[in-house]
Curated annotation (Swiss-Prot):
Designated gene of the protein: guaA
Any one cellular-component term (Gene Ontology): cytosol
Protein name as catalogued: GMP synthase [glutamine-hydrolyzing]
InterPro entries associated with the record: Class_I_gatase-like, GATASE, GMP_synth_C, GMP_synth_GATase, GMP_synthase, GMPS_ATP_PPase_dom, NAD/GMP_synthase, Rossmann-like_a/b/a_fold
Residues annotated as the enzyme's active site: C93 (nucleophile), H179, E181
HAMAP family: GMP_synthase (MF_00344)
Keyword vocabulary terms for this entry: ATP-binding, Glutamine amidotransferase, GMP biosynthesis, Ligase, Nucleotide-binding, Purine biosynthesis
Length: 525
């Protein structure tokens, strides 16, 4: 048997609540909700061995939902040894059913399915104490627990689930058939908090100040007396990562900012002014706009543009690093990788590789770096909170997500200097009006897209025009995995449309994209 001492255990700022992922679309969301209760959490696949889980020294376990039936061939199984670790356990949906089955309860095909909003009847217990006796919850199940394990109290039911929740408070075990992690379960966060703080007895220690202090100490330990390079993009992730490292090692960090000419209005000046003023970091700016535009000439295909921009960025960054080092040595490269990136890339923990994430990828072989990724355990909202804790200005911390290829993938068609200027002007108007209307905190991001290869007929003054359309794509989201279009007030949309068609040359039409994700992605390209 593999002993815990033989297992590579990732360094974390605190002992985690482990979310055991049984294939749920909401596993990351569960981890986020646990952290919103000020408790550190991580996602681990159900294929992890009991030795691996024990080695992580969890303070509690949450068993996630999943698409399978506990009776199906090849369905994920719950190792009963998990329930003997002596830590509190909460089962959700499939995890609830697997938990019930492992403990001797009965899971059956009742013939009644529940998908979507369902009425939950609270029958007592501690998990739902002080909450409404009848409350809406979000269900997604075909099978149901029809008999709780011995020693468990049935504390809730629904039309399709005679046992919709059970608990054994003295054993610190509980489970719910519904999804407390989704916004469609209004009291779900209270139920999760009740489990974490009352059942598990965990304190609220996962705070921005504690996170920042722990990460700074980790970086200080990793880099020691070494030197580091950080590629700044102008976005919040790289800015906060750089600020943490700068706080840890001071002037032994050098930041490189590549201006590829595809930035939004004022972004280069903002980085040079606000970031340096807030951190005191050494910053080297590379003006590569002309090089990027030359490389993009004649290219309209979205993937082709992405590859060219990525390749040119690597070359510009490589040249800047060589100039900065000038014969000296920097052993570490700082990247703003976030926790969703780690999970989606496989995370080294047996999960499927959905996509690769690299802030700076494909560096030449003779540039040898050890990666420093101080944010790799954080979600976006936590990154913003840490940034505020470090004193970064709101102009950086509250910045909407912006793609690495910049405006290059918000121009549908070939990228030219004139088209970039047109889109940049329209984008600045949209940002000004949304900020003036107080909508920045309601919108995850608002891509502004130029349909450069499309023209439409219009009338301005006494003449006929033949101009380009601009597309507004305001979306609301928590993590960009799913998104809904934001209901921007009509009067704000009217001001935006009027200003763009009056102030931006060759644009005579503004349209609104009202498609959710899925089926559409947030960006057009």
């Amino acid at each position: 048997m593999v002993q815990p001492a033989d297992i590579d255990v990732p360094e974390t700022p605190a002992r985690p609540v482990l979310v055991v992922d049984f294939g749920a679309q909401y596993a990351q969301l569960i981890a986020r909700r646990v952290r919103e209760a000020r408790v550190f959490s991580e996602v681990i696949p159900h294929t992890a061995s009991i030795e691996e889980i024990r080695a992580r020294q969890p303070v509690a376990l949450v068993l996630s939902g999943g698409p399978a039936s506990v009776y199906a061939d090849g369905a994920p199984k719950l190792d009963p040894a998990l329930l003997d670790l002596g830590v509190p356990v909460l089962g959700i949906c499939y995890g609830f059913q697997a938990m019930a089955q492992a403990l001797g309860g009965i899971v059956a095909h009742t013939g009644t399915r529940e998908y979507g909003r369902t009425e939950l009847k609270v029958l007592g217990g501690k998990l739902h104490s002080d909450l409404p006796e009848v409350q809406p919850v979000w269900m997604s199940h075909g099978d149901a627990v029809t008999a709780a394990p011995d020693g468990f109290d049935v504390v809730a039911s629904s039309a399709g689930a005679p046992v919709a929740a059970f608990e054994a408070f003295d054993r610190r075990l509980a489970g719910v058939q519904y999804h407390p992690e989704v916004m469609h379960t209004p009291h779900g966060q209270q139920v999760l908090s009740r489990f974490l703080h009352d059942f598990a007895g965990l304190g609220a220690q996962w705070t921005p100040a504690n996170i920042a202090n722990a990460l700074i100490e980790q970086v200080r330990t990793q880099i020691g007396d070494g030197h580091a390079i950080c590629g700044l993009s102008g976005g919040v992730d790289s800015a906060v990562a750089a600020a943490l490292v700068q706080r840890a090692i001071g002037d032994r960090l050098t930041c490189v900012f590549v201006d590829h000419g595809l930035l939004r209005a004022g972004e280069r000046a903002q980085v040079q002014r606000d970031f340096v003023a807030a951190t005191g970091a050494n910053l080297v700016t590379v003006d590569a706009a002309e090089t990027f535009l030359e490389a993009l000439s004649g290219v309209s295909a979205p993937e082709g543009k992405r590859k060219i921009i990525g390749r040119q960025f690597i070359r510009a960054f490589e040249g800047a690093v060589r100039d900065v080092l000038d014969g000296k040595t920097a052993e570490f490269l700082v990247q703003g990788t976030l926790y969703p990136d780690v999970v989606e890339s496989g995370g080294g923990s047996g999960t499927a590789n959905i996509k690769s994430h690299h802030n700076v990828g494909g560096l030449p072989d003779d540039l040898k770096f050890t990666l420093v990724e101080p944010l790799r355990l954080l979600f976006k909202d936590e990154v913003r909170a840490v940034g505020r804790e470090l004193g970064l200005p709101e102009e950086i911390v509250a910045r909407q997500p912006f793609p690495g290829p910049g405006l290059g993938i918000r121009i549908v068609g070939e990228v030219t200097a004139k088209r970039v200027d047109t889109l940049r002007h329209a984008d600045s108007i949209v940002r000004e009006e949304l900020t003036a209307a107080g909508l920045d905190n309601q919108i995850w991001q608002c891509p502004v897209v130029l349909l450069a290869d499309v023209r439409s007929v219009g009338v301005q003054g006494d003449g006929r025009t033949y101009g380009h359309p601009i597309v507004l794509r305001p979306v609301s989201s928590e993590d960009a995995m799913t998104a809904d279009w934001t209901r921007v007030p009509y009067e704000v949309l009217e001001r935006i449309s009027t200003r763009i068609t009056n102030e931006v040359a060759e644009v005579n039409r503004v349209v609104l994209d009202i498609t959710s994700k899925p089926p559409a992605t947030i960006e057009w390209e």
